[in-house]
């Protein structure tokens, strides 16, 4: 079962520059209750890479557009009330529908 985000990460993200795409992604994922394990699979990166983005590290050009679109979709669905995910099953189903394949 995926773990929730640590309070340390939540505090770091809240203090980080929101103009960084990775920080915006982290805020969206935390607010939407999407586990990093599933988000990493959806973005086709490792959890280590995902967490480095969350902390403001640069995102390679080939991934940056995907991250920005993903973040926009999650923020939009949160505003519509489709998120936050109620549990990990809901989060997994949401991401599987988004990417069109099993996680």
Where would I find each of the regions flagged by the language model?
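Short, charged recognition helix plus adjacent turn
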Residues: 1-6, 78-103
């Amino acid at each position: 079962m995926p773990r929730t985000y640590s309070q340390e990460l939540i505090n770091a993200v809240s203090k980080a520059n929101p103009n960084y795409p990775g920080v915006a992604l982290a805020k969206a994922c935390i607010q939407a209750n999407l586990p990093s394990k599933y988000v990493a699979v959806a973005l086709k990166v490792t959890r280590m890479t995902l967490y480095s983005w969350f902390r403001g590290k640069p995102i390679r050009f080939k991934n940056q557009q995907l991250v920005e679109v993903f973040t926009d979709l999650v923020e939009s669905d949160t505003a519509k009330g489709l998120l936050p995910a109620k549990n990990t099953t809901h989060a997994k189903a949401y991401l599987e529908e988004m990417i069109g394949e099993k996680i």
